[in-house]
Swiss-Prot record:
Species the sequence originates in: Arabidopsis thaliana
Effect of residue 435 to R: In hth-3; fused organs and increased genetic instability
Substitution effect: residue 294 to E: In hth-2; fused organs and increased genetic instability
Segment forming the signal sequence: 1-19
Name the UniProt record assigns to this protein: Protein HOTHEAD
The organism's taxonomic lineage, starting at the top: Eukaryota, Viridiplantae, Streptophyta, Embryophyta, Tracheophyta
Cofactor(s) recorded in Swiss-Prot or TrEMBL: FAD
Tissue note: Expressed in roots, leaves, stems, inflorescences and siliques. Found not only in epidermis but also in all sub-epidermal cell layers.
Keyword Phosphoprotein on entry: no
Gene name tied to this protein: HTH
Result when mutating residue 564 to S: In hth-5 and hth-11; fused organs and increased genetic instability
Free-text function comment from the UniProt entry: Probable FAD-dependent enzyme. Involved in regulating post-genital organ fusion. Required to limit cellular interactions between contacting epidermal cells during floral development.
Entry's Gene Ontology cellular component terms: extracellular region
Record keywords, A-Z: FAD, Flavoprotein, Signal
Amino acid sequence: MALKLFLFALLLCLPTSLSSTASKGKEKKSKFNPYRYTFIDKASTFSSSSSSSFSSNGQDSSYDYIVIGGGTAGCPLAATLSQNFSVLVLERGGVPFTNANVSFLRNFHIGLADISASSASQAFVSTDGVYNARARVLGGGSCINAGFYSRADAAFVKRAGWDPKLVKESYPWVEREIVHQPKLTLWQKALRDSLLEVGVRPFNGFTYDHVSGTKIGGTIFDRFGRRHTAAELLAYANPQKLRVLIYATVQKIVFDTSGTRPRVTGVIFKDEKGNQHQALLSNRKGSEVILSSGAIGSPQMLMLSGIGPKKELQRLKIPVVLENEHVGKGMADNPMNTILVPSKAPIEQSLIQTVGITKMGVYVEASTGFGQSPESIHTHYGIMSNKNELFSTIPAKQRRPEATQAYITRNKYQLHEAFNGSFILEKLAYPISRGHLSLVNTNVDDNPSVTFNYFKHPVDLQRCVEAIRLVSKVVTSNRFLNYTQCDKQNVHKMLSLSVKANINLRPKQLNDTKSMAQFCKDTVVTIWHYHGGCLVGKVVSPNRKVLGVDRLRVIDGSTFDESPGTNPQATMMMMGRYMGVKILRERLGNKAGV
């Protein structure tokens, strides 16, 4: 049934612009260039001769900055740094511009269902038994998420030690290029009214700001349903000083350990043909390698490069460059639970538009519809359907591996929905429970082992119980009766439906739906907002420099001990711009021009 594919896709949360403000006077988009920008090319094109034009001193083929990961933070960071310095971005995935499963809202779930080697998302399952995904595409998580855009609150900015003035300047830099005001669907309007009815007040209208009450947030989907990703922020770049290599998988960061402190000299990466290359960092003062590979990729890369817990590095025979027991520690994921709401009639597709920001530290959102049609499918895989029986268009009683495969073959372009409806979700802000990340092997292409310890702390579980009670009130509110005809007596039926949906690999108590605590444990999933692993004060300094080594920073969500705002992508992109400006000003002062 469509429930499983649709639910998994959104639970894993996580275009072409009609007018580009940034591109005026900057990089012109080539009509026939599948990579859109002339500075983007495949990793196999890298050579000493081709990179020498970016040399900062005219003597060797080196770069002032090498950014590992062209994601939500990496793209705006690279675009900003390129205003004054030579920058090389190494992205392990491809481009989003010609990928229909990334570009169109109606294909949101299909893009996440694609688990092929060239997919924009790489699936993994935490040791908690919860399905998850990490981006593998230029633009990062902004290419595979639900598109909701909302800023962090002022308290987060203060705790981060950021300059409030520069933060306020950096958010609009992102918003001008890729963010839009959504056109509310009827269901999202119903959610808005229901939240107000049950007391999530006041109504704050359409705003990017994080304020208590009910509001409408921004979206990176335009009115035509096309996604605009962080990759489009590269339109701000100086094309003469930026080079972006796709399908460039960094193997490790290279250090010179002959001095008193390890000093970064470059990186080794593999191209799409399997050939290895070494990119060199300029010897100029201030040159750096910047890790922007996300909360999974950045701690993994540090350990593969010899920075991390000594015993773990020695276990895998990785030469120890710097012992730091905190690498990979402090991992957290905001637990999400949902109540599935069947509908009497087909519902227009919508991703996150309306959000209720409660004072109990819980965010309430909703998503509806299935959106996919036979014409919209470009690559269809079903979410690991052959192994985990999650293929959504097969009725539950028929969902066996052999039946699933036969169904895919027989009905690849003739899919229909076995479930019609939507779900209301609650995300727990500021979880206390913490986990860890560790290497499985030394192959960077393989996922590390990740544990989040959902609800290990009793306070997290109690807050989830309160949140589910709130969501139950929302779905039984007067405003939702027109859609669901669900009264208070039917709530447990919906809870039972939610538990039975095969949305994780955790043991379930199917006969205990009256226990809200058990419901939380049974139905926990991710909303893609995992963070930690390279925390400030433990692995990096407040300015994101890696402690104990020279010429290395980490700028991404791995440095956060909490997820900013209702959804973090706005702050991730803002941080890329913010840190880029800070770095330029540190090196050039008033001459930076930003």
